[in-house]
Amino acid sequence: MIIGVPKEIKNNENRVALTPGGVSQLISNGHRVLVETGAGLGSGFENEAYESAGAEIIADPKQVWDAEMVMKVKEPLPEEYVYFRKGLVLFTYLHLAAEPELAQALKDKGVTAIAYETVSEGRTLPLLTPMSEVAGRMAAQIGAQFLEKPKGGKGILLAGVPGVSRGKVTIIGGGVVGTNAAKMAVGLGADVTIIDLNADRLRQLDDIFGHQIKTLISNPVNIADAVAEADLLICAVLIPGAKAPTLVTEEMVKQMKPGSVIVDVAIDQGGIVETVDHITTHDQPTYEKHGVVHYAVANMPGAVPRTSTIALTNVTVPYALQIANKGAVKALADNTALRAGLNTANGHVTYEAVARDLGYEYVPAEKALQDESSVAGA
């Protein structure tokens, strides 16, 4: 199979879909890999490293996109939709519930789109987990930075000092992002509260952190109280493939103290805070509303691309090899985890939460893939 790795064009997205090591694994299995010139530079990988691994360095992005399977990091931007075609296998993060125009374009062009974030093995999301770990850890340190007065914050040191109270961190969502945010916040010495719907998960968090955190069951009263007290609010809710629910209302934000900070990690699925009304970028990461600093960057791990790219390649390559070795149709038929990642195929929306949120008919993956001639690698 011919596999294309284009350069990411999202604002300050310095990750790349494959390391040279990942390329070598695909090539050793008999596949061709086309890497766009400079695709790995942001992550510290020179063109020569990819060439040494056996990749072909291509200057023209169209030629890269003409590959049978394209591997990316972030969702394609509108200027990349022109490359969509029937038979293309696209393997990347998509977050389609928050990207209706992208979903429509993929559907219209008959692209076989497999989303990293919905590939699932049991109750785990193996291709989302490493980036969730990165984003969670970053959320605490970014929040700490923006609490500094020169960054617009109230001038709070999360750790406090002897004789001065510690900063209060509220984390909504006790999954991978929330747990990693808590690890960092606890490590910084903050006063940490975690809110989650699942009482069993809260028990697990109590076992992990003990007396270092407080836990609360998720309901509007507990959320309102914890948000009002927070110096830093970290939003870490995930419903796989679906749009994030609004849990923090504008009225709750108004009750926060001036200079408090919100980091909404769920923004790539629409966000859970009513006042987080647009995505921000690494160039302009924050805005102020009701006296509160809002951080809503959708590609947080792109700021630490070396770590993120290596972590991502570690988990995506085994699945990419299955697609490349077997062809997309057989790989999807054989592997239920990979099949759960299928979001569009042959003009159909094949992930139920995306179909529901965007108002499309849901077509099960098995039915959508019956016409094998519509899928690359068949």
Swiss-Prot record:
What does the record give as EC number? 1.4.1.1
Superkingdom: Bacteria
Subunit details: Homohexamer. Trimer of dimer.
InterPro entries the record matches: Ala_DH, Ala_DH/PNT_CS2, AlaDH/PNT_CS1, AlaDH/PNT_N, AlaDH/PNT_NAD(H)-bd, NAD(P)-bd_dom_sf
Q: What does this protein do?
A: Catalyzes the reversible oxidative deamination of L-alanine to pyruvate. Oxidative deamination proceeds through a sequential, ordered ternary-binary mechanism, where NAD(+) binds first followed by L-alanine; the products are released in the order ammonia, pyruvate and NADH. Disruption blocks sporulation probably in stage V; 20-30% sporulation can be restored if the media is supplemented with pyruvate, suggesting lack of pyruvate blocks sporulation. Thus it is a key factor in the assimilation of L-alanine as an energy source via the tricarboxylic acid cycle during sporulation.
Protein name (record) = Alanine dehydrogenase
Enzyme's top EC category: oxidoreductase
Catalytic-site annotation from UniProt: H95 (proton donor/acceptor), D268 (proton donor/acceptor)
Per the record, what phenotype accompanies loss of this gene's function? Strain cannot grow on L-alanine as a sole carbon source. Disruption of ald causes a sporulation defect, most likely in stage V.
Describe which pathway this protein belongs to, using the record's wording: Amino-acid degradation; L-alanine degradation via dehydrogenase pathway; NH(3) and pyruvate from L-alanine: step 1/1
Gene3D superfamilies in UniProt: NAD(P)-binding Rossmann-like Domain (3.40.50.720)
UniProt organism field: Bacillus subtilis (strain 168)
Family designation: Belongs to the AlaDH/PNT family.
What does the induction field say?
A monocistronic operon. Induced by L-alanine in minimal media. Constitutively expressed in rich medium, declines during sporulation. Induced early during sporulation on minimal medium by L-alanine. Affects its own expression. Transcription activated by AdeR.
Query: Which one GO biological process term can you cite for this protein?
Result: sporulation resulting in formation of a cellular spore
